[in-house]
């Protein structure tokens, strides 16, 4: 059984994240979307909120599980018995950062493989930060994020 970990902040989770998770779940037996608990990073949603939003948003993906961690990613990957880290790339601009991260992770844990998924074309142009900005200005993000996230963003920004 191959377990893969898809780590991220997921602040908030987007349809692009879910697309990567769904595609990864067709290849791996289990995909754990692991929310990185970053106490030093300014985030819109708390770790508990991000986990809850992810759980609601992945109910339709039976091979996708949700968890949280606050250690080195490779240490977390090993702790859950996984052998693969899943990452997504939207555009060429993501490649350098992902390449550097992969090199660091492979140096720390040569036994863990990194698998990069290219974003589906409809998800290449936006990120979680884009979603937050649009939502903060009162824009419609329902086509970018799952329903539970739309509702959460409306609560945060107090609109509509």
Curated annotation (Swiss-Prot):
It catalyses: (R)-4'-phosphopantetheine + ATP + H(+) = 3'-dephospho-CoA + diphosphate. ATP binds at residues 9-10, 17, 88-90, 98, 123-129. Keywords: ATP-binding, Coenzyme A biosynthesis, Cytoplasm, Magnesium, Nucleotide-binding, Nucleotidyltransferase, Transferase. Its EC number is 2.7.7.3. It comes from the Bacteria. Gene3D superfamilies: HUPs. The keyword Methyltransferase does not apply. One of its GO terms (cellular component) is cytoplasm. GO terms for molecular function: ATP binding; pantetheine-phosphate adenylyltransferase activity. Transmembrane segments: none annotated. Substrate binds at residues 9, 41, 73, 87. Its cofactor is Mg(2+). GO terms for biological process: coenzyme A biosynthetic process. The record marks 17 as: Transition state stabilizer. InterPro entries: Cyt_trans-like, PPAT, Rossmann-like_a/b/a_fold. Homohexamer. Reversibly transfers an adenylyl group from ATP to 4'-phosphopantetheine, yielding dephospho-CoA (dPCoA) and pyrophosphate. Belongs to the bacterial CoaD family. This is Phosphopantetheine adenylyltransferase. It comes from Roseiflexus castenholzii (strain DSM 13941 / HLO8).
């Amino acid at each position: 059984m191959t377990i893969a970990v898809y780590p991220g902040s997921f602040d908030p989770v987007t349809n692009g994240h879910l697309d990567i998770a769904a595609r990864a779940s067709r290849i791996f037996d289990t995909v754990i979307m692991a929310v990185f608990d970053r106490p030093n990073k300014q985030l819109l949603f708390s770790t508990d909120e991000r986990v809850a939003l992810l759980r609601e948003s992945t109910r339709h993906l039976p091979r996708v599980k949700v968890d949280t961690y606050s250690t080195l990613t490779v240490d977390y990957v090993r702790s859950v018995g996984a052998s693969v880290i899943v990452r997504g790339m939207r555009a060429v601009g993501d490649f350098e950062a992902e390449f550097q991260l992969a090199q660091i992770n492979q140096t720390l844990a040569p036994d863990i493989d990194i698998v990069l998924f290219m974003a589906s074309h409809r998800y290449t142009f936006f990120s979680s930060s884009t979603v937050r900005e649009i939502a903060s200005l009162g824009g419609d993000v329902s086509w970018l994020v799952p329903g539970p996230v739309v509702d959460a963003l409306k609560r945060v920004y107090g609109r509509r």
